């Protein structure tokens, strides 16, 4: 039996609804958040599959979608030497169940996804900022986060400490016009003959 058939059989056994999605060179499934933990547990404990290693967990922001955040789990079966991708989607106000009780590696990944996107994981109450500064405002990988941020960090020599100030730009935003004012030569350089039509 092929790997995708084994996974679909396992999902059916536990009445878990999964949808196969196209991801180049990988087997991937989309799942609703409430099915996530039972599915991860079944994949880990299945004697045939043994997806015991969480190699990555990350977020993706699609601000125009109703379920804005996609949370992606990359699993590895050492028994089969195969990878599996599990995707789930949540809106900005929803939270997702923490996978750290099933896959302990999820702990740090969940902190990172919270820090970068603001996605809350039920069961992981640690809200430390591990990639941004302690007083950082917002979540920098959201597509609506301003390029300049909200505050700038400076070392104040008089106070002898780091201070946070609102962003103050000395110049206006520049519009980058990539059209060149330089003109190409009217003759063809050796090797460029193929570009001529």
Curated annotation (Swiss-Prot):
Mode of membrane association: Peripheral membrane protein
GO cellular-component term (any): plasma membrane
Catalytic reaction equation(s): a quinone + NADH + 5 H(+)(in) = a quinol + NAD(+) + 4 H(+)(out)
Keyword tags: Cell inner membrane, Cell membrane, Membrane, NAD, Quinone, Translocase, Transport, Ubiquinone
GO MF assignments: NADH dehydrogenase (ubiquinone) activity; NADH:ubiquinone reductase (non-electrogenic) activity; quinone binding
Main location: membrane
Pfam family for this entry, one: Complex1_30kDa
Subcellular localization, as worded in the UniProt entry: Cell inner membrane
Top-rank taxon: Bacteria
Statement: the UniProt record of this protein carries the keyword Transport: yes
EC code(s) of this entry: 7.1.1.-
Enzyme category, top tier: translocase
Keyword Mitochondrion: no
PANTHER family reported for this sequence: NADH DEHYDROGENASE [UBIQUINONE] IRON-SULFUR PROTEIN 3, MITOCHONDRIAL, NADH DEHYDROGENASE UBIQUINONE IRON-SULFUR PROTEIN 3
UniProt family annotation: Belongs to the complex I 30 kDa subunit family.
Protein function: NDH-1 shuttles electrons from NADH, via FMN and iron-sulfur (Fe-S) centers, to quinones in the respiratory chain. The immediate electron acceptor for the enzyme in this species is believed to be ubiquinone. Couples the redox reaction to proton translocation (for every two electrons transferred, four hydrogen ions are translocated across the cytoplasmic membrane), and thus conserves the redox energy in a proton gradient.
Assembly behavior: NDH-1 is composed of 14 different subunits. Subunits NuoB, C, D, E, F, and G constitute the peripheral sector of the complex.
Name listed for the protein in its UniProt record: NADH-quinone oxidoreductase subunit C
Organism the protein comes from: Rickettsia prowazekii (strain Madrid E)
């Amino acid at each position: 039996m092929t790997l995708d058939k084994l996974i679909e059989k396992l999902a059916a056994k536990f009445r878990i609804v999964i949808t196969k999605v196209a991801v180049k060179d990988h087997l991937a499934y989309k799942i609703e958040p409430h099915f996530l933990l039972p599915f991860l547990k079944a994949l880990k404990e299945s004697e045939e599959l043994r997806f015991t290693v969480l190699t990555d967990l990350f977020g993706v922001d699609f601000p125009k979608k109703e379920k804005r955040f996609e949370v992606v789990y990359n699993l590895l079966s050492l028994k089969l030497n195969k990878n599996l991708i599990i995707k789930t989607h949540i809106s900005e106000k929803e939270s997702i169940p923490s996978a750290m009780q099933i896959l302990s590696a999820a702990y740090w990944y969940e902190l990172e996804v919270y820090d970068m996107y603001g996605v809350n994981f039920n069961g992981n109450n640690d809200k430390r900022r591990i990639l941004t500064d302690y007083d950082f405002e917002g979540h920098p990988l959201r597509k609506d986060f301003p390029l300049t941020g909200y505050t700038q960090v400076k070392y104040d020599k008089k106070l002898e400490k780091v201070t946070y100030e609102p962003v103050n730009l000395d110049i206006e935003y520049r519009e980058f016009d990539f059209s060149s004012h330089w003109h190409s030569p009217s003759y063809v350089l050796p090797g460029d003959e193929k570009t001529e039509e």
